[in-house]
Amino acid sequence: MPKVQLKILDSRLGKEFPLPDYATAGAAGLDLRACIERPLAILPGATKLIPTGLAIYIADPRFAAVLLPRSGLGHKQGIVLGNLVGLIDSDYQGEILVSCWNRGAEPFTLAVGERIAQMIFVPVVQMEFEQVETFTATLRGEGGFGHTGRH
């Protein structure tokens, strides 16, 4: 298993709140928690940047981390990521912050230590552009946004 360096920035992690870990052998994501000092109200339509109390350093440019919303918060409470998905580059070393957006109709109170997002690690391929005047024709061509049909 590849290694990622982890820096604990909030002393409550590992004591009051568990460190990120895979819940099951088949789990793809690690839960990130709100390392806030007091409950935080997020009004409808508002976004808040939430500290997680940790920083990671992936180092290997063949990998990146992706932050995703927790399905229960999004479906039941209307809390999703303000940027829809977060990307942590391999060379980033600062605190992981989660942009929380309340797309619901009611205020939402985020509890201290609440699980707010999940983080997965993904492979990365850096491509090199080759500038051309035309592309080799394909069946699809420039068709997009529903071009292949609804059903």
Curated annotation (Swiss-Prot):
Magnesium listed as a keyword: yes
Known EC number: 3.6.1.23
Task: State the Gene Ontology terms under molecular function.
Answer: dUTP diphosphatase activity; magnesium ion binding
| Positions contributing to substrate binding | R70, S71, G72, N83, L87, I88, D89
Quick one: which pathway? Pyrimidine metabolism; dUMP biosynthesis; dUMP from dCTP (dUTP route): step 2/2
Catalysed reaction(s)? dUTP + H2O = dUMP + diphosphate + H(+)
Q: Which InterPro entries match?
A: dUTPase, dUTPase-like, dUTPase-like_sf, dUTPase_trimeric
Protein family = Belongs to the dUTPase family.
What's the protein name? Deoxyuridine 5'-triphosphate nucleotidohydrolase
Q: Which Pfam families match?
A: dUTPase (PF00692)
Q: Which cofactor does it need?
A: Mg(2+)
Where do the TM regions start and end?
none
A GO biological process this protein is involved in? dUTP catabolic process
The protein's job, in short, is: This enzyme is involved in nucleotide metabolism: it produces dUMP, the immediate precursor of thymidine nucleotides and it decreases the intracellular concentration of dUTP so that uracil cannot be incorporated into DNA.
Q: Supply the alphabetized keyword list.
A: Hydrolase, Magnesium, Metal-binding, Nucleotide metabolism
Fetch the SUPFAM superfamilies from UniProt: dUTPase-like
